[in-house]
C-alpha cells in the first residue's frame, strides 16, 4: 500500500553559507556507517513544508488533522517515523487506495540548511465502489454484496449499502458514517436495516425492521459506544410443529432502547490470541424511550490469554448476563439469552440448553459460562514457519448454566439457582485460523452434566465463527 522514501541519507549540515554550494563534491565524502547512523539519529532538522499530490474532493482540514505531528519531528529518524504514522492514519480514513511518502531536502528561497519537505502522494478511491465477499459468523456462513460511497462530502464520510444472504439470516441495510477530524476513534453513524432470521432450535422466525444511531469514543484505554435503537419486530413460527409457548410469542412488538458498551482489549489478535486480555460490558435499557417492550439487560465477557513454554497458549474465558423485565409483562423470547453449541459450551447442540417446551428452546433470563483452553502446536510441527502455523491443537473444559430467575427472591437464591444443574464438557480437537477473519474448530466433545431436555452432540463437533467461549 505504499512506502516511505528518503531522497538522500547523507548527513545534513545544520548551518553554513556553503550548504547550497557543495555541488558534486558531496558525492565523494565517505562516512563510516556507524558514524553516519549516529549523525542521522541526532541531527536536528526542521520539516518546513508538507505537500499532497493527488488530492481531489478531499478537504484540507481533515488532512491537516492527520499529518500535524510530522511538523513536530526534530531529526530525520523522527521525520520518517512520524511520516509513516501519518500515512497509516490517512489509510485508516478509508478514502485513499494508496499513500506513498517522499522525504527530500527543502528547496526554494526560504529553504533552511537543515530544512526538509515531506510529500504525500495519494490515490483517492473512486466515488462509487462495490464489493463481493463471503463472511463467517457464529456457525453461519453468508454471501455479502456491498456498494459504498467513500468520502462523500470530502471529510471521510461514508454511505454504505449492504445485502447479506446467509444460511440462517438474510439482511440488507443502509448506513452513514462520519468520523471526527483528527480523532478517527470518535465517530457517529446512522443505520437503517431489515433482518430476517430463522432459529430452528426455537422453531422461530423473526423479522426486524429498524434504525439506530450510535456514537463511539475512547476514554483512556477503553472504547465506548452509546446507541439508540428503534426496531419493529415480527415473530412467527418456523414450522407447524412449533410449541404453544412459541406460538404465544408470535406477533408484532416495538422496541426502543438505549444501550452502552465498553471494551478493553489488549490482545494481539481477536481470532486466536497468544497474549493479552479482553473485557466487554454491555447495558441495555428498553421501554423508557417508547415502545411496548421494557427491560434492563446486562452482560459481560472476560478473556485472559498467556503464552507458555513450547509455543503453547493458556486461555481462560468467562461470560455472564441477566435480563430483568420492567412491569408486569414477561420478557420476550427475542430478548433472552441462549447457550450451547460449538461456539459456547461445546458438546451441546446450538442454543439447546435451558428452558424448553416440546423441544423448542425458549432461552433464559440469566446465564453464566466459563472455559479453560490449552492451545499447542501440531505434533511434530508439520509446515512449521508456513501453512502449519495456522493450525493449533486444542484442549478444553467448558461449563455453564442458563435459567429463569424469580426476581422476588434475594441474590443468594439467584446464585444458588445458577449453581444448580451445571452443564459441562471436555474434549480436544484442531483449530484453524482464517487470517483475522474467523476461525474453524473440529473437536471431539464429551458432554457431562446433561439435564432433561438438553440436546447434546456427543463426539465430533464442527464450529465456525469469530466469538468463542
Curated annotation (Swiss-Prot):
A GO biological process held by the record: mitochondrial respiratory chain complex assembly
Organism superkingdom: Eukaryota
Stretches the record annotates as Disordered: 1-20
Pfam families according to UniProt: Omp85
InterPro entries associated with the record: Bac_surfAg_D15, D15-like, POTRA
Subunit composition and interactions: Associates with the mitochondrial contact site and cristae organizing system (MICOS) complex, composed of at least MICOS10/MIC10, CHCHD3/MIC19, CHCHD6/MIC25, APOOL/MIC27, IMMT/MIC60, APOO/MIC23/MIC26 and QIL1/MIC13. This complex was also known under the names MINOS or MitOS complex. The MICOS complex associates with mitochondrial outer membrane proteins SAMM50, MTX1 and MTX2 (together described as components of the mitochondrial outer membrane sorting assembly machinery (SAM) complex) and DNAJC11, mitochondrial inner membrane protein TMEM11 and with HSPA9.
Family: Belongs to the SAM50/omp85 family.
Note on domains (UniProt): Its C-terminal part seems to contain many membrane-spanning sided beta-sheets, that have the potential to adopt a transmembrane beta-barrel type structure.
Name of the protein in question: Sorting and assembly machinery component 50 homolog
Species whose genome carries this gene: Homo sapiens (Human)
Amino acid at each position: 500500500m505504499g512506502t516511505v522514501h528518503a531522497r538522500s541519507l547523507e548527513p545534513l549540515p545544520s548551518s553554513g553559507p556553503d550548504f547550497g554550494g557543495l555541488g558534486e563534491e558531496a558525492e565523494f565524502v565517505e562516512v563510516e556507517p556507524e558514524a553516519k547512523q549516529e549523525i542521522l539519529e541526532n541531527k536536528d532538522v526542521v520539516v518546513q513544508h508538507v505537500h499532497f499530490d493527488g488530492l481531489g474532493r478531499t478537504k484540507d482540514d481533515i488532512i491537516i488533522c492527520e499529518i500535524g505531528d510530522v511538523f513536530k519531528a526534530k531529526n530525520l529518524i523522527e521525520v520518517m517515523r512520524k511520516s509513516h504514522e501519518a500515512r497509516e492514519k490517512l489509510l485508516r480514513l478509508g478514502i485513499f487506495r494508496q499513500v506513498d511518502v517522499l522525504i527530500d531536502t527543502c528547496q526554494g528561497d526560504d529553504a533552511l540548511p537543515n530544512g526538509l519537505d515531506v510529500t504525500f502522494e495519494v490515490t483517492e478511491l473512486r466515488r462509487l465502489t462495490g464489493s463481493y465477499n463471503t463472511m463467517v459468523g457464529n456457525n453461519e456462513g453468508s454471501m455479502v454484496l456491498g456498494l459504498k460511497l467513500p468520502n462523500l462530502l470530502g471529510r471521510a464520510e461514508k454511505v454504505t449499502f449492504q445485502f447479506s444472504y446467509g444460511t440462517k439470516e438474510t439482511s440488507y441495510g443502509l448506513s452513514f458514517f462520519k468520523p471526527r477530524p483528527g480523532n478517527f476513534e470518535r465517530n457517529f453513524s446512522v443505520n437503517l436495516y431489515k433482518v430476517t432470521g430463522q432459529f430452528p432450535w426455537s422453531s422461530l422466525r423473526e423479522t426486524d425492521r429498524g434504525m439506530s444511531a450510535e456514537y463511539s469514543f475512547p476514554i483512556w484505554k477503553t472504547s465506548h459506544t452509546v446507541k439508540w435503537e428503534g426496531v419493529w419486530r415480527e415473530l412467527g413460527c418456523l414450522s407447524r410443529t412449533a410449541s404453544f409457548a412459541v406460538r404465544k410469542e408470535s406477533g408484532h412488538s416495538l422496541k426502543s432502547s438505549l444501550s452502552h458498551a465498553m471494551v478493553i482489549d489488549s490482545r494481539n489478535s481477536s481470532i486466536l490470541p497468544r497474549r493479552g486480555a479482553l473485557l466487554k460490558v454491555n447495558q441495555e435499557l428498553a421501554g423508557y424511550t417508547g415502545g411496548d417492550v421494557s427491560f434492563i439487560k446486562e452482560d459481560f465477557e472476560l478473556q485472559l490469554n498467556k503464552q507458555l513454554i513450547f509455543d503453547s497458549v493458556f486461555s481462560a474465558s468467562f461470560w455472564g448476563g441477566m435480563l430483568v423485565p420492567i412491569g408486569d409483562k414477561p420478557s420476550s423470547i427475542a430478548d433472552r439469552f441462549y447457550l450451547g453449541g460449538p461456539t459456547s459450551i461445546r458438546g451441546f447442540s446450538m442454543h439447546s440448553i435451558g428452558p424448553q417446551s416440546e423441544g423448542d428452546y425458549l432461552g433464559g433470563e440469566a446465564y453464566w459460562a466459563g472455559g479453560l483452553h490449552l492451545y499447542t502446536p501440531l505434533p511434530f510441527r508439520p509446515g512449521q514457519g508456513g501453512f502449519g502455523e495456522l493450525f493449533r491443537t486444542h484442549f478444553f473444559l467448558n461449563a455453564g448454566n442458563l435459567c429463569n430467575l424469580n426476581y422476588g427472591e434475594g441474590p443468594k437464591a439467584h446464585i444458588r439457582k445458577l449453581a444448580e444443574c451445571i452443564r459441562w464438557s471436555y474434549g480436544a480437537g484442531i483449530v484453524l485460523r482464517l487470517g483475522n477473519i474467523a476461525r474453524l474448530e473440529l473437536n471431539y466433545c464429551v458432554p457431562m452434566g446433561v439435564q432433561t431436555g438438553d440436546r447434546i452432540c456427543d463426539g465430533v463437533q464442527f464450529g465456525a465463527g469469530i466469538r468463542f467461549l
